[in-house]
A protein has these predicted regions:
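Short Lys/Arg-enriched alpha/beta "domain-start" segment
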Residues: 6-45
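Active-site metal-binding core of divalent-cation-utilizing nuclease and nuclease-like domains
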Residues: 44-58, 64-68
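A conserved ligand/cofactor-binding region detector
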Residues: 51, 61-65, 85, 106-111, ...
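A broadly used, surface-exposed interaction patch
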Residues: 59-111
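Internal, well-ordered alpha/beta segment that forms a basic, Gly-enriched binding/recognition surface
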Residues: 103-232
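Hydrophobic, aromatic-lined core segments that form the binding pocket/scaffold
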Residues: 173-400
Length: 401
């Protein structure tokens, strides 16, 4: 199956978006699925997303949808543009005779679909995905690229040594800080955009559930946050919530602690112990003091800023001791700190950089130590990891050119 790539204009320049990313969005249901409408105005409900076909033919087989409450079964084909159907000559290909829904990313300039029949001549509806996406297109593309980079780094301890080999040892920390700063700016940009669209309370509700769903169940958790408010969830059990997304959970390969039912139970415990956590979270920015001429050395910064005290305040007070381990650290660096920066205009980069490492490849610390990056003054931190993955991403893109 050919993986077609389109170039889109992102906030940080052109971004390559693979058609596979669109297929993953459909497969995981990582878009707003309530109040879906076809291009011709019919109400669309998705009963089954179908099986992802990675061979020739339609992208998804055995899909079930409701069009104006009428059940229809068949296949789904996904493209960037409606006219890709003609460019790929699907209209004359019998393999596409059962397509019932054409999912496209971008709308037809005229606003009206021109392709309304599959290769058998039966009616085929069109859904434009762009208005229903949960996140910025650039964020989807970047996430996909970063997952590939993390998998690459996880495979080999020598990968980081090779990555840093052409950088003099005395400059490595500075280079990683520069890349980490870029990563921070990206996170803050995407966070601020989502904040503007959703509002503080809903945004917080969604990002915490999404983080608890990493990596395989982010979309299902996001959909739960859209369907049920925190108030509604308080009257539900983890079993109720789990069943509400029945058929959309990925139960492999995850550890028992990461099972969605256990993660939902954690979130319900947070709502029970601290129902006002979103308000407390917004006010928590006062705990971050402004440090002039902050040192780059993690050990010194953590002491100067009283970072452990701040860390424990979030863990024990805001999140009421309900979230622990690397998943709590991931929540803070991937969601909470960028969100606080986005809503208060405070530059929290140094705190984010020197924060504890969250979920990451198991060999990252040993690899950085072997590359002479880590020391007593520079223990492992979130920022070093973020710098590594963005540096690897940029170098991998350069190699492909």
């Amino acid at each position: 199956m050919k993986n077609i790539v389109a170039e889109i204009q992102g906030s940080y320049g052109p971004v390559n978006l693979a058609e596979r990313v669109l297929q993953k969005i459909w497969c995981s249901g990582d878009f707003r699925r309530d109040n879906l409408k076809t291009c011709t105005g019919e109400k669309l409900e998705i009963v089954k997303f179908g099986e992802w076909n990675k061979l020739d033919g339609p992208d998804f087989k055995n899909v079930e949808i409701l069009i104006d409450n009428i059940k229809i079964c068949g296949d789904v084909e996904i493209h960037f543009y409606e006219n890709d159907w003609n460019l790929h000559q699907h209209g004359g290909n019998a393999a596409y005779r059962n397509v019932i829904l054409h999912v496209v990313l971008f709308p037809n300039p005229s606003g009206t679909p021109k392709i309304t029949e599959n290769s058998r001549g039966d009616s085929m509806k069109t859904l434009v995905l762009l208005p229903y996406l949960n996140r910025d297109l650039e964020e989807y593309a970047l996430d996909e690229a970063l997952v590939a980079v993390e998998m690459q780094l996880e495979k080999s301890e020598s990968g980081i040594a090779e990555l840093l080999a052409d950088i003099p040892e005395r400059e490595r920390i500075d280079v990683l800080r520069e890349r980490a700063r870029e990563r921070w700016q990206q996170k803050c940009f995407f966070s601020k955009k989502r904040l503007t669209e959703a509002g503080w309370t809903q945004f917080c509700h969604q990002i915490v559930l999404e983080t608890l769903g990493l990596k395989h169940n982010r979309a299902a958790m996001s959909h739960l946050a859209q369907r049920f408010s925190t108030t509604t969830m308080l009257g539900m059990s983890a079993e109720n919530l789990f069943n509400a997304e029945a058929g959309n959970w990925k139960s492999f390969p995850i550890r028992p602690a990461n099972h969605p039912k256990n993660r939902l139970a954690q979130y319900l415990k947070l709502l029970e112990k601290n129902p006002d956590w979103q308000t407390m979270l917004k006010a928590s920015v006062a705990h971050f003091q402004k440090i002039e001429n902050a040192t780059k050395w993690t050990q010194i910064f953590r002491k100067q800023s009283q970072l452990k005290r701040i860390h424990d305040y979030f863990k024990e007070q805001v999140f009421a001791g309900t979230l622990t381990g690397t998943r709590f650290e991931t929540l803070m660096v991937d969601a909470i700190l960028p969100a606080l920066a986005g809503t208060t205009e405070r530059d929290l980069f140094e705190y984010w950089f020197h924060w504890n490492l969250g979920d990451a490849p198991a060999n990252i610390q040993k690899s950085l130590k072997n590359a002479n990056v880590l020391s007593r003054e520079m223990p492992m931190s979130n920022g070093l990891f973020q710098g590594v993955i963005l540096l690897e991403l940029q170098k991998s893109r350069s190699r492909k050119k």
